[in-house]
Amino acid sequence: MNHVGRKCSMSAIVGTTNAGKSTLVNVLVGQKVAAVTPKVQTTRVRMHAVSNHENVQLIFIDTPGIFSPKTKLEKFLVKHAWMSLKGIENVIVLVDVKNYLNQHLKKIIDRIKHSNLNAILVLNKIDIVHQSIVSEVIEYMYSLYKFSKAFTISALYGIGIDKLVDYLCETSPYGPWLYNDDQISDAPLKFFMAEITREKLFITLRHELPYSLSVVTELVEEKEDNSLIIKQVIYVTKDSHKTIILGKKGEMVKKISMESKSDLENILQVKVHLFLFVKVREFWQNHLNECVGYAE
């Protein structure tokens, strides 16, 4: 690989829960690499997503939303979020324009003040508010911290993304690429598979289901016809949650399985045989090996 003239940078995307971090990462990369749901705290672990633009490789670190941790799982997530700020060029502070008066956002800013990182302000969801509100939020955010640059976007509709990418490409330092040309993430395949199913669960069940569930891909087996057998376990903390996921006569879990199967086949370009199992484990949140989406 010829490194001459190449540029590479790493940017961590931080923000409060449900600010749109995973949606932004997927748009920047051009493929689904992180779960996108209406639920808060759906990103379990930090993940590197890769986007190449001619001679520039942009690496984005999708982080768990930073909030006040209580359980062992939540403390694990927040620790990983702050670990993402080590050894990077930029920190992108993603702000939901309808939820900018947030105490956790102030805590994030206070932490960044002591990091000496190039902090970029990105206001998301501008498609749902008036321009006057956007200006008000920018003014407020700059009263908290002097950001190097500010951008306004709608990650959902792709508004303003090009300007953000152009800036990141322009300011990236010269250096070799860290990932191959065709690589879009450093997450294991089993993790990707679990993320797809977890997204379908949250989107389908929305307010009926808490975020305290985990999907673990326990088996991926290739058949002679090149199709894949995928077995996943959905861990929940209560019998009532299991009942919700299964649905009447198993119709709900069948629906989720079909939707996840469809996405997996589109992404992997192979036929998929997906088997979902729902298990109750009251304190699964204290078993960190089951929080990352895959089993070795």
UniProtKB/Swiss-Prot annotation:
Region (G4), start-end ranges: 124-127
Record-annotated Era-type G domain positions: 7-174
Record flagged with keyword RNA-binding: yes
Protein residues bound to GTP: 15-22, 62-66, 124-127
Record flagged with keyword Membrane: yes
UniProt region (G1), positions on chain: 15-22
GO terms of biological process kind: ribosomal small subunit assembly
GO molecular function, one term: small ribosomal subunit rRNA binding
Start and end residues of each KH type-2 domain: 205-282
Keywords for this protein: Cell inner membrane, Cell membrane, Cytoplasm, GTP-binding, Membrane, Nucleotide-binding, Ribosome biogenesis, RNA-binding, rRNA-binding
Pfam families noted in UniProt: KH_2 (PF07650), MMR_HSR1 (PF01926)
Location of region: G2: 41-45
Region (G5): 153-155
Membrane topology: Peripheral membrane protein
GO cellular component: cytoplasm; plasma membrane
Region span, G3: 62-65
Subcellular location(s) of the protein: Cytoplasm; Cell inner membrane
Family, as annotated: Belongs to the TRAFAC class TrmE-Era-EngA-EngB-Septin-like GTPase superfamily. Era GTPase family.
Quaternary structure (record): Monomer.
Described purpose of this protein according to its UniProt entry: An essential GTPase that binds both GDP and GTP, with rapid nucleotide exchange. Plays a role in 16S rRNA processing and 30S ribosomal subunit biogenesis and possibly also in cell cycle regulation and energy metabolism.
Listed name of the protein: GTPase Era
Species assigned in the record: Ehrlichia ruminantium (strain Gardel)
Gene from which the chain derives: era
